[in-house]
Structure formats: structure tokens, C-alpha cells
Amino acid sequence: MKTILQLAGARLILGGGLLAAVVVAGCSDDPVAVDPVTTVQKTGSTDNQQTAAGTVVPRSPQVILFRASGAKAIGETVTFTVEGGGGTVDGAVAVTDTRGIATVREWTLGQIAAANFLKATANGLEVTFTATGIAGPATAVVATLGQEQTALVSTEVAIPPAVRVVDQFGNGVGGQTVLWQVLSGNGLVLGSGSTDSESDGLAQVLGWQLGPTPGQNVLEAAASGFPAVQFTATAIP
């Protein structure tokens, strides 16, 4: 039969073991578990940028992470995802540096001139960057309205010819001067023989009067540095 002293000693040993287990369980070598990331912020200079559609933004988007204690979060993973605009991202997964900052390698905007959005996610938290894609340099002039018309001699065609000045992706480029010139048929350009493209790239002549002789009439639209566009119309008696 165990003595009272032996039983008391066993209880003490058992109790000490439980106490040690509790102490060990309460301690952790993982700083993330006791001081998690609670804040994800954009760095101001990398948000709300503007650049030509289909090109890389000048400043790569960055976020800075903070822990619950207010300390900068080092070594945390941030995922960057394109949310709108059709662009692409290079370096979609980044790790925060000693400053708590994670930077995407490159963000290329979509080819359509429009708003673009990039989301950064870390520890279930997210922020969204916005960038605006605008038309790039003009590369071509294309006919949009008024091709292959027919009208009585010495009268105007029903639809005044129009062209669109576009960049390499087809976005309209404003502020480009278009010159209108009759090439054949002895017709007349009504209004000014020079028009500037609107913000959507559209440039339209006020009117085109065909010549006095039945047959084909040709009108040319040209902008400096690009192949000209020709419109044809048939004058009938």
C-alpha cells in the first residue's frame, strides 16, 4: 500500500508536468503568430498613374505591410492580381523587404485606352491600384464614314467623309491635323480644308460637293507622316 507521502509526491510530479506543458504551449518562436500583419498600404507615388495603353507604368506598384504592434512586416508574401483593364503583371508574387515593402516587377496596362486595376493581397488583406491607359502616339489614319457614295452632279454627298487618327492599338488620338483635298472630279470641299481630330480621334469634313460632270470623284484625307486615305463617290446626272 502506497503511503500518503508517496501519493503526494506523485501528484506533485504530475502537476509539475502539466504546468511545464502549459508554459511550453504558451510560448512560440513564430513572431507571425503573436504579431500578425494587420495593415496593407499603398505607397502614394505608385497609385493613380497614367501612361500609354499597352505600356508599362512608369513606377512599379508598391505596398508596405505593418504588424499589429506597428512594426514593419518583413518577409511576408504579397500577391498582385490584375482586376480590370486587360493588362498583365510580371512578378505577381513578391516578398516584403527590410522596410516592409513589396514591389511588383512590372505592370503593363491593357491595349484599350481605359482605367486599369491591380489588386495586392497579403494575409487576407487587400488594396487596389488604379492606372489610366491613354492613347499613344498616332500611327495611322483610317476611314470611318462616307465611303462609296452616290449623289447628283454638283450636289453634296449625304454623309460628310470622316477619318479616325489612331495609335498602334486602334485608340483614337486627338489634336491631329487632317488635310482634305479633292483629287479628281472637280468637286469642292465645303468649309475648311483642314480639321483637327477630336479626343476620340475623329476628324470630319463639313461637306463634299461633287463635280459638274457625271463620273467618279475622289477626295483625299491626309495627316502628316501617315499614308493618306481616299474616298470615292459617283456623280450621276
Pin down the residues of each PLM region:
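Sec-dependent bacterial lipoprotein signal peptides
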Residues: M1-A25
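The feature marks long extracellular or luminal low-complexity segments
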Residues: V24-P237
